[in-house]
Amino acid sequence: MTDTQNEAFKMPVNKIRLFEHGAPGSQNLKLTRKYYTEDMPDGRVKHIVQNITDPDIVPYIPDGIGNSTDRQRIPAVLIIPGGAFRRLVYNFEGEDVAKWLNSMGIAAFVLECRLPSDEHDNAEDVPLIDAMRAMRVIRGRAQEFGIDEAKIGVMGFSAGGFMAALLSTAYESDVYADYKYKDEYDKLSARPDFAVCSYPVISIDDCIEAGKRYMSEEQVLEIISDSETKILHKYNPDKLVRPDMPPVFICETDDDRTTLSENSVGFYMAARKAEVSAELHIFRTGGHGYGCGDDFAQTGEWKVLFTKWIKSIGII
């Protein structure tokens, strides 16, 4: 296994490895982790991470918070960036969101998870394995970071939104039951206490049906990669919804032609049918991949709505 850090942009150095003895399913895979930038038409620059075999979480903790018995414990969020199951958009859907959460007094941990596009054993399972392990590690180290272990949520964007939905419904999965290096963290719950899914992909059927409004089915299928197809066929959060899953907040735009709002509507309806507390917002415009959103446009409103929602469920 090779997982180097040839960085085209500066990454934090305080990462927490999720598996000290090698991640299950990747022990024999040799990849060089890649960090690179990608210019966007609007002048912004994406920070991209690829080829992950040794997953980790990057902590972002508000100033003045730490291991102390005389301070009030704060909530925390596991952030899962998107990237079409082939890469991670670290800045817009990771670090920027973490810093915004910190400004609200919420700790954040950005997940650098393995991706199903690489040749891991059981590649469709590795993002879920990493997300479950990340939740357990955060919960196990809650005191160290001054975190309330009963207020740890998950937030994901695009493909990361799928993972947030999946973790919220499949948190008792036995996807790494045979891993021989389990430790005390693995005895802890991987269930998030709340979930946020931003412009998520959820169902491959919804993707195909909605996409046919804009192009032929053949064109839709050409856009969806093999790795996307495999993980979406194996896991459908719509069908995994359960009454004891955490409250969920979902946001999307009506003009998103990448994941399409039908995904968000379907997940919301499945949650409501299971009598799960759910809130859904669909903005008229904003497209796909807006991350924290534009404070001068509709997409920036999701942060305001999220803040009101998280207060309403007693997290802050």
Show where each model-derived region lies.
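C-terminal catalytic histidine-bearing segment of alpha/beta-hydrolase fold enzymes
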Residues: 251, 261, 265-316
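Primarily recognizes the serine-hydrolase "nucleophile elbow" in alpha/beta-hydrolase
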Residues: 133-212, 232
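Catalytic nucleophile-loop/oxyanion-hole region of alpha/beta-hydrolase
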Residues: 88-97, 111-149, 295-301
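N-terminal cap/lid segment of alpha/beta-hydrolase-fold proteins
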Residues: 3-72
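Mobile cap/lid helix-loop segments that gate and shape the active-site cleft of serine hydrolases
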Residues: 37-44, 177-184, 193, 200-240, ...
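Short beta-strand element of the alpha/beta-hydrolase
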Residues: 73-82
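Acidic catalytic loop of the alpha/beta-hydrolase fold
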Residues: 203-204, 255-259
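Short beta-strand/loop motif that positions the catalytic acidic residue
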Residues: 244, 249-252, 256
